[in-house]
Swiss-Prot record:
Family annotation (Pfam families): Cadherin, ECD, PCDH15_12th
Function recorded in the entry: Calcium-dependent cell-adhesion protein. Essential for maintenance of normal retinal and cochlear function.
Pro residues composition-biased segments: 1426-1444
Region (Disordered): 1426-1446, 1601-1623, 1745-1766, 1928-1955
Protein name per Swiss-Prot or TrEMBL: Protocadherin-15
Extracellular side: 27-1376
Organism: Homo sapiens
Compartment(s): Cell membrane
Membrane-topology descriptor: Single-pass type I membrane protein
Residues in the signal sequence: 1-26
Gene responsible for this protein: PCDH15
């Protein structure tokens, strides 16, 4: 005590002195310190370019005064670089100093921050403090981005898929830069609209604006556009959009031509508005029965040619070629006759065609690229087989009549009718050709070739106009047409063309004006004048209508048809009046074409004339008559009228001198008097007079007669023109001569047309009779022609005449000399003498008078040869030497010419090749004259001895230089019989198996000869020595097989040793074969074979070497003597090593798994290969997976198959992905390893598409790998690296809700994984990728689907469709409201949780503080402990209640019972106040309860008049002390218990058993004769809750028995101890209590029930309603019994019946319901502490039957800390019954730690302990071992009920047996402790809790000893058998409670303070 006092005194003194020192210095230490909190540095921010004087810091807040009369601090700036900062020390302000400069954060200044130190000097104490000020310069967006280049350029192929990045030129430093910082300096790229190139921004896009990578947005087409100008805008990312700065550049994108178009046949005529060519058909015609040599190549019109439409593919070397072929054709046997060259498209005839069998061939030709492009072009080829030309052409009509409008333009087609509706069709056929085929005739016009022409193709020909025609000039054209087929001509056919009139002429009056006189006596209707206008047109165009326009004044009218002007009706002429009439003459053409003219008629009115002459009706008469008209025909009736009625006499006054016409004098009838001849006179103008006999009574009329022609004359040739003509050959269109014929007929009858009667193909004649050559004539073919010229008139029935002309063809020098052979080849032997003639050449010239001469054209050979100029003889100028020519074939090729000396044509040329024949100049020459060799005497046949060699000097490659060998068997016959030489190699070998004598020498003559002419040879001698057998080494074995050699063996590694022996010979070893690659070497001396080169098992697995051993003498002689003995074979096997690691087929595997996949679903299969063999190629796969939640491994892999499967469920994990590695290790997992990455993405049907095809699922499943590769390719066109994964293959589902299945079709469900995002590609995107390429995919699928197989559609899965339908049924408004509500709820839930948790924590802390304060205030003062006195008869009266007596309700019944026991134990010698210190250690919160019970009545009611609190109370298990109501308080219940409440307890105990009565008597001693009983319900039905007492009561045994009897009478369901009895409580309803209320009531109920049971009887059976468990007897009980449950069995709430017999172990076996509702009534022994056997799980806890604890031999060590607790299960009241026995099914779990030395603990969470639990966790429990049966013990059979929340007690047993049982159980049972929860409430603040628990455990042991010692006598009296079991030896009663409590107090003396 003194030491403590001293320490406390020293500590207090130090504290006081330090405080005084601090107070003294505090006022000065604060100066220079910051008056603010927070970080020591001052950080401010300022914008760049801020103005000078900007305040940086308005107050530094440094303590102290820097100005004034008495400053305490001094401020200054340090480290002020460039003096950017100024300071006002008085105001402690900092300013920006930017005088003459600008604060710029950007380059080149790069001022990002300014750091200065404010130095503060404390003037009082002299200390210096530096305060750092950091000025951060904020960036302003004052700089615009700048591009590194003015423009950028990119090229992209037109075949580039959409989505491809085509330009990355802005990456790095190549793009735009902005020297601003942060967002102001970050660049975004966007594409702007380019008005000059509007499509550029639609074609390209920048999806990632920060990178600027340009991506193709639309497909390109080189044929549409080849260049784009894309405007790229770069802008910074300033937060204010209005402040962003931009700049632009232009990216020029050139589109490269790609191979996207196929070939195209030429000529191509495009279909309008498309790029497609019209169908093209090529034409060809071949005559029948012609040989291929005559026709090949066949001429096709137009020539077959195809070009690639992609004409600008770069580089040109990549441009594909065109391949031509005949695809199909009819007839089917066309391949017999035709072949098309694949490169040139040249059509060839294979064999003659007979037209009787084949009239035509229709072929389809194909042009395709030679690179396999899938777009070929097709065209037709029509081949006509022509008949043999033995028939002349003919016309289908004898003549043709055509019509043409005279106004028709040039090129108009002649019509066949007057209405001009259809053209004139001229059909010419050839009998050699079918009528339906074009005979390809040439049609010629014999006349008017300058006016008309005829089309030259087709069966039907048409005449067209070459120049305008005029009907008025020539009304008809008549000519003939002749058809010519190349050999024969047709008969000419006459064509008559009539020119139809057009209104091209205007009516014309003869005079412009007329003067006429009229008389006053003329009457209306009298004629004034008849006007006549003339119009040369015909028909209505020539019909004239007359009209008076003006001037008539209504007095005159005109006849519209005749033009006769008469006096109008009712008009009288007035003398002197004059009229000027304007008369119009107009034709009757359509109004738009009508023509007219006018004239003026002047009329004067005169007085009347009474003697007027006769008058004709008209003054002019016109008529036409044919010259063939008969004589006497009436032509005209001329009738004149005389006003006076006088007779009139008619006469022809003029115009008919020949008297051709007759005129009747009286009648005026004009008739024909003579025959007409139009050729002599074609017009007559007759003047006819009419006279009445008076002199002035004569008038005249004019008759105009035109004589029309008839064809009565044939054309007549001019006899004076020459008929012998000549023409020069080789001139086309050369003038030959002219003929002329005349026809006196008029019109067409007199028009003469010329034509040729023959040779129309060679000559032509014009319309004027000029004859020209139609083609070039060749005199050499024909030099004379008789040409027939035909002259025909143009009548309908024409007349014609002929003329024969003699035409001679004149020769010109138009042919060159032609050699008889174009090539001459001559073989000349070398060394022929000069002047030898070696060749005669000849040439001919077909021209007349030609003189041919010869000469050598090649000057380089003129020194070898001479050519005679006239004879053509070729001779040598010198001899030729074959060896002088460098080529293998010595030849000279040159040109010779033949020319006409007097001609002008170029010379003829021929090629002469002179081949020099080698004449074998040199013989072979041996390299040696004598060769030596050695041979073994027993050498076998074929043993090589030596090799001879000869060389020939003749040029190599010629027969003269080929050297061969043979043996000369003439000189040495015997050696020649046993030896031979190989003909080509010269190797001398044995011919037979030798058996010769050693040392024999043979001579062999070898001859070398060549194959030249003549054959030349030479010889050499070979000396062969037969060796002695002893001189030939001999191998010890014929074959050597060394151990296998590792392929990793290094160079020099020994393989094996070979050994040979010889007599007195040094042996040399060598490898003679099998070592071509020099892989092995051999030591020539030792015979060690070693590795000389790299080995590779994978390349070669074994070698066979042939080794030879020779003597050194033989080797030095450069010889070898092979024999049977000195050669051997070495077989070397190569051993494979693990030198190649496994290699995966892919470096990156992509797979997917559906989120509803089951466990161990296959995901994908990986495969690795290894070049090694055997075990080294056997893989073992394993996965390296990063940690997954809850320690699960998501995937597993089959070790030897590589099949990856799922190892977990993936519910609700869509869009998750897993990345891990798969390792393949060869040699079954012990060798080298390779790895690959695996990506598995979790998907569901929202990511999938269904590909529906019309093939069965079985077929798709067989081809699924190939089909998946095709789908991969198309998806990867859009997303590189993407992988298509097949989810399922099944029958097609269709119909409503997809309920029908069609197994003839297939549903292929797929999805795709994007390796960039590691997730599934959006379902809609996948649909676009596949549906857009559906046609191409079908083409690729065709080889696998078969004929007709294809994809029908791509649709969404049925699950997605149903979701869509449900989603569509929800309106947009409702959906939006729901979404809004959902968002609000999500936002509110966290806030509510935060509030609840905060409030909960606040209430917990508040309750703990309140409880702690109350406990500390209520604890009495402690007194020293004294030994316990002997028991007394009755307890002394209790003292007055302390101030804390109201804690009774707050601490609860369990605390009261516990403290009451300690109160009674200590009343003998020590008062409660004296034991306060010890009780404070044992249970600090129980002192108030003890004092409260000191003032209690004997019946248990409190003497305090204070109202008992109904406030909420707290157990240690509670997390919220305000969460439960005090169950001991009930309103309107008396303070003192009455007997009326006894009936409420009769349901729970059975005190009438003998054991219970005996026990109750023994327990009623002098100290206490009353038992206290509390009852509390846990989750009871409402019916039973009324019977549960709410207040603590004290009743005696008789009251209890009476209450029980009453309950029995009411049949309240007391359960007997018989197993299997029914319990009425099982049918009751369950009360609605919260879990916490259930737990709290259960805790109280268990404590009360256990006390009552123990007070009634410790050896009787007692049964309560309880959960359904299986029970059996426990083995010998140790301190703890492990209770371990199966995974499906909750081991917390359990009860077991313990019999003290080894045959019934107590185990747990139950499945529990939601709630626990046990009802427990236990008698409570007031004289005994039964609480040491209790543990208190928080929610549910099974109990085991504990035994009384033995006294501890030594203080126990601290028990292990509890592990975390499991959540409690629920217990249903319907699972309760009295426990039947059953064998244990599971090991017992380890109970939680308890403070009692001996207990049967429970598993599961503990209930609140009476003392604090251990705060530290338990170590891992040892493995559980089943408990074997213990040794037999004579225990009394006692049944105990284990009730939830408590531990059952049982009868005491002898200490020896207890000890033995403990020992046995501890050695045979390994107990496992279930985790406990951490301490709650005030126990969390208890320090040294482990030591405290240890001390309390010792204290309980001492208390138990004292109790047993005082009650053993009574127990022996009342229950001897029990007393025997309850004896305890005196050795166990060691130790003192006071000592234990004192030691505990020293260890935790400050616990109350801490609390």
């Amino acid at each position: 005590m003194f030491r403590q006092f001293y320490l406390w005194t020293c500590l207090a003194s130090g504290i006081i002195l330090g405080s005084l020192f601090e107070i003294c210095l505090g006022q000065y230490d604060d100066d220079c310190k910051l008056a603010r909190g927070g970080p020591p540095a001052t950080i401010v921010a300022i914008d760049e370019e801020s103005r000078n004087g900007t305040i940086l810091v308005d107050n530094m807040l440094i303590k102290g005064t820097a100005g004034g009369p008495d400053p305490t601090i001094e401020l200054s700036l340090k480290d002020n670089v460039d003096y950017w900062v100024l300071m006002d020390p008085v105001k402690q302000m900092l300013f920006l100093n930017s005088t003459g400069r600008v604060l710029d954060r950007d380059p080149p200044m790069n001022i990002h921050s300014i750091v200065v130190q404010v130095q503060c000097i404390n003037k009082k104490v002299g200390t210096i403090i530096y305060h750092e000020v950091r000025i951060v310069v904020r960036d302003r967006n004052d700089n615009s981005p700048t591009f590194k280049h003015e423009s950028y350029y990119a090229t992209v192929n037109e075949l580039t898929p959409v989505g491809t990045t085509i330009f990355t030129g802005f990456s790095g430093d190549n793009g735009a830069t902005d020297i601003d910082d942060g967002p102001n300096g970050q660049i975004e790229y966007v594409i702007q609209y380019n008005p000059d190139d509007p499509t550029s921004n639609d074609t390209f896009e920048i999806p990632l604006m920060l990178t600027g990578n340009i991506v193709l947005r639309k497909r390109l087409n080189y044929e549409d556009k080849t260049r784009y100008f894309v405007i790229i805008q770069a802008n910074d990312r300033a937060q204010n959009l209005n402040e962003r700065r931009t700049t632009t550049t232009t990216l020029t994108v050139d589109v490269l031509d790609g191979d996207d178009l196929g070939p195209m046949f030429l000529p191509c005529v495009l279909v309008p508005n498309t790029r497609d060519c019209r169908p093209l058909t090529y034409q060809a015609a071949i005559p029948e029965l012609r040989t291929p040599e005559e026709l090949n190549p066949i001429i096709v019109t137009p020539p077959i040619q195809a070009i690639d439409q992609d004409r600008n593919i770069q580089p040109p070397s990549d441009r594909p070629g065109i391949l031509y072929s005949i695809l199909v054709g009819t007839p089917e046997d066309y391949p017999r006759f035709f072949h098309m060259h694949p490169r040139t498209a040249e059509l060839s005839l294979l064999e003659p065609v007979n037209r009787d069998f084949h009239q035509k061939f229709d072929l389809v030709i194909k042009a395709e690229q030679d690179n396999g492009h899938p777009l070929p072009a097709f065209a037709g080829l029509h081949i006509e087989i022509l008949d043999e030309n033995n028939q002349s052409p003919y016309f289908t009509m004898p003549s043709y009549q055509g019509y043409i409008l005279e106004s028709a333009p040039v090129g108009a087609t002649i019509s066949d009718s007057l209405n001009l509706t259809s053209p004139l069709r001229i059909v010419a056929l050839d009998k050699d050709i079918e009528d339906t085929k074009d005979p390809e005739l040439h049609l010629f016009l014999n006349d008017y070739t300058s006016v008309f022409t005829v089309t030259q193709t087709g069966i039907t020909r048409y005449l067209t106009l070459l120049q305008p025609v005029d009907r008025e000039e020539q009304q008809t054209y008549t000519f003939s047409i002749t058809a010519f087929d190349g050999v024969q001509e047709s008969e000419p056919v006459i064509v008559n063309i009539q020119v139809m009139d057009a209104n091209d002429n205007t009516p014309t009056f003869p005079e412009i004006s007329y003067d006429v006189y009229v008389y006053t006596d003329m009457r209306p209707g009298d004629s004034v004048i008849q006007l006549t206008a003339v119009d040369a047109d015909e028909g209505s165009n020539g019909e004239i209508t007359y009209e008076i326009l003006v001037g008539a004044q209504g007095d005159f009218i005109i006849n519209k048809t005749t033009g006769l002007i008469t006096i109008a009706p009712g008009v009288e002429m007035i003398v002197g009046r004059t009229y000027a009439l304007t008369v119009q003459a107009a034709d009757n053409a359509p109004p738009a074409e009508r023509r007219n003219s006018i004239c003026t008629v002047y009329i004067e009115v005169l007085p009347p004339n009474n003697q007027s002459p006769p008058r004709f009706p008209q003054l002019m008469y016109s008529l036409e008559i044919s010259e063939a008209m008969r004589v006497g025909a009436v032509l005209l009736n001329l009738q004149a009228t005389d006003r006076e009625g006088d007779s009139i006499t008619y006469a022809i006054e003029n115009g008919d001198p020949q008297r051709v016409f007759n005129l009747s004098e009286t009648t005026g009838i004009l008739t024909l008097g003579k025959a007409l001849d139009r050729e002599s006179t074609d017009r007559y103008i007759l003047i006819i007079t009419a006279s009445d006999g008076r002199p002035d009574g004569t008038s005249t009329a004019t008759v105009n007669i035109v004589v029309t022609d008839v064809n009565d004359n044939a054309p007549v040739f001019d006899p004076y023109l020459p008929r012998n003509l000549s023409v020069v050959e080789e001139e086309a269109n050369a003038f030959v001569g002219q003929v002329k014929a005349t026809d006196p007929d008029a019109g067409i009858n007199g028009q003469v047309h010329y034509s040729l009667g023959n040779f129309n193909n060679l000559f032509r004649i014009t319309s004027n009779g000029s004859i020209y050559t139609a083609v070039k004539l060749n005199r050499e073919v024909r030099d004379y022609y008789e040409l027939v010229v035909v002259a025909t008139d143009g009548a309908v029935h024409p007349r014609h005449s002929t003329l024969t002309l003699a035409i001679k063809v004149l020769d010109i020098d138009d042919n060159s000399p032609v050699f008889t052979n174009s090539t001459y080849t001559v073989l000349v032997e070398e060394n022929l003498p000069a002047g030898t003639t070696i060749l005669q050449i000849e040439a001919k010239d077909v021209d007349l008078g030609a003189n041919v001469s010869y000469r050598i054209r090649s000057p380089e050979v003129k020194h070898f040869f001479a050519l005679h100029p006239f004879t053509g003889e070729l001779s040598l100028l010198r001899s030729l030497d074959y060896e002088a020519f460098p080529d293998q074939e010595a030849s000279i090729t040159f040109l010779v010419e033949a020319f006409d000396i007097y001609g002008t044509m170029p010379p003829g040329i021929a090629t002469v090749t002179v081949i020099v024949k080698d004449m074998n100049d040199y013989p072979p020459v041996f390299s040696k004259r004598i060769y030596k060799g050695m041979v073994a005497p027993d050498a076998v046949k074929g043993t090589p001895i030596t090799t001879v060699y000869a060389e020939d000097a003749d040029p190599p490659g010629l027969p003269a230089s080929r050297v061969r060998y043979r043996v000369d068997d003439v000189q040495f016959p015997y050696p020649a019989s046993i030896f031979e030489v190989e003909e080509d190699s010269g190797r001398v070998i044995t011919r037979v198996n030798l058996n010769e004598e050693p040392t024999t020498i043979f001579k062999l003559v070898v001859v070398a000869f060549d194959d030249g002419e003549p054959v030349m040879s030479s010889s050499a001698t070979v000396k062969i020595l037969v060796l002695h057998p002893g001189e030939i080494p001999r191998f010890t074995q014929e074959e050597y097989r060394p151990p296998p050699v590792s392929e990793l063996a290094t160079k020099g590694t020994m393989v094996g040793v070979i050994s040979a022996a010889a007599i007195n010979q040094s042996i040399v070893y060598s490898i003679v074969s099998g070592n071509e690659e020099d892989t092995f070497g051999i030591n020539n001396i030792t015979g060690v074979i070693y590795v000389n080169g790299p080995l590779d098992y994978e390349t070669r697995t074994s070698y066979v070497l042939r080794v030879q051993a020779d003597s050194l003498e033989v080797v030095l002689a450069n010889l070898r003597v092979p024999s049977k003995s000195n050669t051997a074979k070495v077989y070397i096997e190569i051993q494979d090593e693990n030198n190649h690691p496994p290699v995966f087929q892919k470096k990156f595997y992509i797979g997917g798994v559906s989120e509803d996949a089951r466990m161990f679903t296959s995901v994908l299969r990986v495969k690795a290969t290894d070049k090694d063999t055997g075990n080294y190629s056997v893989m073992a796969y394993r996965l390296i997976i990063p940690p997954i939640k809850e320690g699960k491994e998501g995937f597993v892999v089959e070790t030897y198959t590589g099949l990856i499967k799922t190892a977990m469920l993936f519910h609700n994990m869509r869009r998750s992905y897993f990345k891990f590695q798969v390792i393949a290790t060869d040699d079954y997992g012990k060798g080298l390893s390779g790895k690959a990455d695996v990506l598995v993405s979790v998907v569901n049907q929202l990511d999938m598409q269904v590909i529906v095809s019309n093939v069965p699922p079985t077929l798709v499943e067989k081809k699924i790998e190939d089909l998946t590769e095709i789908l991969d390719r198309y998806v990867q066109e859009q997303i590189p690296g993407a992988k298509v994964v097949v989810e399922s293959i099944g029958a097609r589902r269709h119909g409503d809700a997809f309920s029908l299945e069609d197994y003839t079709k297939c549903d292929l469900t797929v999805y795709a994984i994007d390796p960039q995002t590691n997730r599934a590609i959006d379902r809609n995107e996948l649909f676009k990728f596949l549906d857009g390429k559906l046609l191409d995919i079908n083409k690729d699928f065709q080889p696998y689907y078969g004929e007709g197989g294809r994809i029908l559609e791509i649709r969404t899965p049925e699950a997605v469709t149903s979701i869509k339908k449900r989603g569509e049924s929800l309106g947009y408004t409702e959906g939006a409201l729901l979404a809004l509500a959902f968002i609000i709820i999500l936002c509110c839930i966290p806030a509510i949780l935060v509030v609840l948790v905060s409030y909960r924590q606040f209430k917990v802390r508040q309750a703990e503080c309140t409880k702690t304060a109350r406990i500390q205030a209520a604890l009495p003062a402690a007194k020293p402990a004294v030994p316990a006195p002997a028991p007394v008869a009755a307890p002394p009266p209790p003292p007055p209640p302390p101030p804390g007596a109201h804690l009774y309700e707050e601490l609860g019944d369990s605390s009261i019972l516990f403290l009451l026991y300690h109160f009674q134990q200590s009343r003998g010698n020590n008062s409660v106040s004296e034991d306060r210190k010890h009780q404070q250690v044992v249970m600090p919160f129980s002192s108030n309860t003890i004092e409260a019970h000191k003032s209690a009545h004997v019946d248990g009611s409190l003497k305090s008049n204070k109202l008992k609190s109904a406030r909420k109370f707290t157990f240690l298990s509670d997390e919220d002390d305000l969460s439960a109501h005090n169950p001991l308080y009930k309103e309107n219940i008396s303070q003192v218990s009455t007997n009326s409440d006894i009936s409420q307890r009769t349901d729970f105990v059975d005190p009438f058993s003998p054991k219970i009565q005996a026990k109750s008597k023994s327990l009623r001693g002098p100290r206490e004769k009353i038992q206290r009983l509390w009852s509390q319900s846990v989750s009871l039905p409402r019916r039973l809750m009324r019977k549960v007492p709410n207040r603590p009561e004290i009743i005696d045994l008789q009251q209890w028995q009476g209450t029980r009897q009453k309950a029995e009478n009411e049949n309240t369901g007391i359960c007997t101890n018989k197993r299997g009895s029914s319990n009425p409580l099982l049918t009751t309803e369950e009360a609605n209590l919260t879990e916490k209320e259930e737990i709290r009531q259960g805790e109280t109920l268990m404590i009360e029930g256990t006390e009552q049971l123990k007070s009634l009887s410790s050896d009787s059976s007692f049964c309560f309603p309880r959960p359904h468990f299986s029970f059996s007897t426990l083995p010998t009980v140790s301190r703890t019994v492990e209770l371990k449950s199966e995974p499906n069995v909750i081991s917390s709430p359990a009860e077991c019946s313990l019999e003290l017999s080894p045959s019934r172990p107590c185990v747990l076996h139950s499945s529990l319901s939601r709630r626990e509702t046990p009802i427990c009534m236990l008698p409570i022994e007031t004289e005994r502490n039964i609480f040491e056997n209790f543990a208190h799980p928080p929610n549910i806890s099974p109990s085991a039957c504990p035994l009384p604890p033995p006294p501890p031999i030594s203080p126990p060590s601290p028990p292990p800390a509890p592990a975390p607790l499991a959540p409690p299960p629920d217990i249903s009241p319907f699972s309760l019954f009295c426990p039947p026995p059953s064998p244990p099914s599971i090991p017992l779990p380890l109970p939680p730690p308890t403070f009692f030395p001996l207990s049967v603990s429970t598993s599961g969470p503990p209930t609140p302990p009476l003392l604090p639990p251990f705060p530290t966790p338990l170590p891992p429990p040892p493995p559980s071992i089943p408990c074997p049966p213990p040794p037999s013990a004579s225990f009394l059979s006692t049944e105990c009920v284990c009730i939830t929340g408590v531990k059952c007690t049982t009868n005491l047993m002898p200490a020896e047996k207890i000890k033995s049982s403990m020992t046995q159980l501890s050695t045979t049972t390994v107990c496992k402790t279930d985790p406990q929860r951490e301490p709650k409430g005030i126990l969390r603040h208890v320090k040294n809790l482990a030591e405290l628990e240890k001390s309390v455990a010792n204290m309980y042991s001492q208390i138990e000893k004292n109790y047993l010692r005082t009650n053993v006598s009574e127990l022996q009296t009342m229950c001897p058998s029990e007393v025997t079991n309850m004896e305890i030896t005196s050795e166990q009663n060691k130790g003192s409670l006071n000592n234990i409590v004192e030691g505990t107090e020293k260890q935790s003396h400050s616990q109350s303070t801490s609390l």
